[in-house]
Amino acid sequence: MPHESRVGRRRSTTPHHISDVAIELFAAHGFTDVSVDDIARAAGIARRTLFRYYASKNAIPWGDFSTHLAQLQGLLDNIDSRIQLRDALRAALLAFNTFDESETIRHRKRMRVILQTPELQAYSMTMYAGWREVIAKFVARRSGGKTTDFMPQTVAWTMLGVALSAYEHWLRDESVSLTEALGAAFDVVGAGLDRLNQ
């Protein structure tokens, strides 16, 4: 891959900056053809500095995902307990996936890399597990059960399916907003969630 020089003052190093730089490279050249050295060079940092933020190249497209999971946890924790499970999950899912207009283009590139790169799919399953754990904990708390119980796990897997199907649709059809796609996908399974409150 050709090396690209950077002009101007280097921005401070953050996981977000490194991931943004990498996403642009992956989108332009393909995940396989971009090396860790390419990313470090484009970000204006040393290879060893990059590995202080990310354990592997596969982790980079996900950005600071632990922070995002904490945000999802916070959204769920702040939902009034009187709100029905279906409405609570729908509200949290939409809020978690709402971005400023300026972020939409970059987020589309990021999700295209994550969902459409075969080499990333095994790693992505480990990341999805963390996301499902947050959902399952919330459902278990609402139902008075354990996170590992069948019902919370089933709801968590279902919510992952909702999110992934919505993102796939959003990537295929750029005329559809992400919130529209997520809302429509959620409503397909919403009736089943309603029955959990009965």
UniProtKB/Swiss-Prot annotation:
Ranges for domain HTH tetR-type come to: 12-72
Q: Which GO terms describe its biological process?
A: regulation of DNA-templated transcription
Q: Which GO terms describe its molecular function?
A: DNA-binding transcription factor activity; transcription cis-regulatory region binding
Arranged from A to Z, the UniProt key words for this protein are: DNA-binding, Transcription, Transcription regulation
Q: Which Pfam families match?
A: TetR_C_14, TetR_N
- Its biological function? May regulate a gene cluster involved in mycofactocin expression. Mycofactocin is a conserved polypeptide that might serve as an electron carrier.
Entry's NCBIfam families? mycofact_TetR
* Name this protein carries in UniProt: Putative mycofactocin biosynthesis transcriptional regulator MftR
From what organism does this protein derive?
Answer: Mycobacterium tuberculosis (strain ATCC 25618 / H37Rv)
Question: What is this organism's lineage?
Answer: Bacteria, Bacillati, Actinomycetota, Actinomycetes, Mycobacteriales
The gene coding this protein: mftR
